[in-house]
Amino acid sequence: MIPVVIEQTSRGERSYDIYSRLLKDRIIMLTGPVEDNMANSIIAQLLFLDAQDPTKDIYLYVNTPGGSVSAGLAIVDTMNFIKADVQTIVMGTAASMGTIIASSGAKGKRFMLPNAEYMIHQPMGGTGGGTQQTDMAIAAEHLLKTRNKLEKILADNSGKTVKQIHKDAERDYWMSAEETLAYGFIDQIMDNTKVK
């Protein structure tokens, strides 16, 4: 169930679903697993807000366990494509593909709430049963290329070396807000809409 808010206007009362109301304030909610339908919705909202006014920041709130690499990279590419700066605010968890998205916000405008967590790891993939050996080799090569691409993005976003990212992402690597700030994935920790 999506909450509805009622707003008083000069023409009377108007009701909005909460996400439409937040969009009026240039706020986009990226919550739940990253998948194609969710990514398409986020991309459409980014493009809409950029077309409305490319000089005003867009606020992307992130709380996701991660998900599809291709869907996540489509969001990142759109964030980089539009003219408006995208501020990212991590609440809850930014894990896996969520870290790629959250750390790709405009430099100096990547935030995290005090009790939120970050997690990086290597991408996951596989082939189903009955797969031919040559198809398995193709899938393994693609997975390695994907890992290299994601590690380069994380290195660029954090200031760490690709070698350091590769080492840390070998297994699930969890970070608190303070650790994420020290690592370089965010620029500041927020508390009550104030920056620490």
UniProtKB/Swiss-Prot annotation:
Q: Which NCBIfam families match?
A: PRK00277.1, PRK12553.1
Q: Where mainly located?
A: cytoplasm
**BP GO annotations:** protein quality control for misfolded or incompletely synthesized proteins
Q: Which reaction does it catalyse?
A: Hydrolysis of proteins to small peptides in the presence of ATP and magnesium. alpha-casein is the usual test substrate. In the absence of ATP, only oligopeptides shorter than five residues are hydrolyzed (such as succinyl-Leu-Tyr-|-NHMec, and Leu-Tyr-Leu-|-Tyr-Trp, in which cleavage of the -Tyr-|-Leu- and -Tyr-|-Trp bonds also occurs)
Name under which the protein is recorded = ATP-dependent Clp protease proteolytic subunit
* Signal peptide boundaries: none
Would you name any one GO CC term?
endopeptidase Clp complex
Q: Native species of this protein?
A: Streptococcus suis (strain 98HAH33)
EC number annotated for this UniProt entry? 3.4.21.92
Matching entries from Pfam families are given as: CLP_protease
Task: Name the job this protein performs.
Answer: Cleaves peptides in various proteins in a process that requires ATP hydrolysis. Has a chymotrypsin-like activity. Plays a major role in the degradation of misfolded proteins.
Does the record bear Transport in its keywords?
A: no
Q: Which family does it belong to?
A: Belongs to the peptidase S14 family.
The active-site annotation reads: 96 (nucleophile), 121
Instruction: Give GO terms: molecular function aspect only.
Output: ATP-dependent peptidase activity; ATPase binding; serine-type endopeptidase activity
Compartmental location: Cytoplasm
Q: What class of enzyme is it?
A: hydrolase
Q: Subunit structure of this entry? A: Fourteen ClpP subunits assemble into 2 heptameric rings which stack back to back to give a disk-like structure with a central cavity, resembling the structure of eukaryotic proteasomes.
What keywords would UniProt list here? Cytoplasm, Hydrolase, Protease, Serine protease
* Database matches in CDD domains: S14_ClpP_2 (cd07017)
